[in-house]
Regions:
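Non-heme Fe(II)/2-oxoglutarate
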Residues: 1-90
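A generic structural micro-feature
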Residues: 2, 93, 119-125, 174-176
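Acidic, glycine-rich loop-and-strand cores that form catalytic or ligand-binding grooves
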Residues: 89-105
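Conserved active-site beta-strand-loop modules that form the wall/rim of enzyme catalytic pockets
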Residues: 99-100, 109, 140-141
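Histidine-centered catalytic micro-motifs
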Residues: 110-118
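Catalytic core of Fe(II)/2-oxoglutarate
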Residues: 113, 124-125, 138-190
Length: 190
């Protein structure tokens, strides 16, 4: 049986790309990055090798100066368009907190196939999104094994997809390049 892909892509404002990478650099300089977490918040570099910034934990930063306010507006509008495109526009979803900035070094990645709504703390994730902040020429994309589909990492591209088992995914390792993304989720508005 062939699964139907519900992956859709949108273009992100250029100011978001530049602002997010600048913000990540500032956070790294100030030791505000954390090792990437998997599962129930564990750090396991054999599964995920990244440095992450949780924008929710930066209340003292003027995020609007880095374009994050326009990004959030863009993502909200794109999510509604996405839901309309898959004939689910009647659902009222909300962004589940601010997105995360994730940096994958060369040979880093989220190596294990996973879904984004797998535990009690993440079961409210209905729609996931990834914005690629830089173009990666060799690897760096997102692979959806059950769909036999890979999204390439192209600066400014945002993809939306269901967070459940039909769209399990994993990172494609970039052997020689860095990869920067913004990730987040939408869930019930109740």
């Amino acid at each position: 049986m062939k699964l139907t892909s519900y992956i859709r892509s949108y273009e992100c404002p250029q100011e978001t790309i530049e602002g997010a990478i600048e913000l990540f650099g500032m956070c790294k300089d100030m030791d505000f990055t954390v090792p990437g977490k998997v599962g129930m918040g564990d750090v396991d570099k054999t599964i995920k090798d990244s440095e992450d910034v949780y924008l929710e934990s930066l209340p003292m930063f003027p995020l609007h100066e880095f374009g994050m306010d326009s990004y959030v507006k863009h993502i909200d509008e794109a999510c509604q368009d996405y839901l309309d495109s898959i004939h689910l526009g009647y659902y009222q979803l909300r962004m589940l907190g601010l997105p995360q900035i994730q940096h994958y070094p060369p040979k880093g990645g989220y190596f294990q196939e996973h879904i984004d709504s797998y535990s009690n703390s993440t079961c409210n994730r209905i729609i996931g999104y990834i914005t690629y902040l830089n173009t990666v020429d060799n690897g760096g994309g997102t692979h959806f094994p059950h769909l036999n589909h890979t999204e390439q990492a192209v600066a400014g591209k945002t993809i939306f997809f269901p967070s459940g088992v039909t769209h399990a995914h994993k990172g494609v390792v970039a052997p020689d390049e860095h990869k920067y993304i913004l990730v987040g989720w939408f869930g019930p508005s109740c």
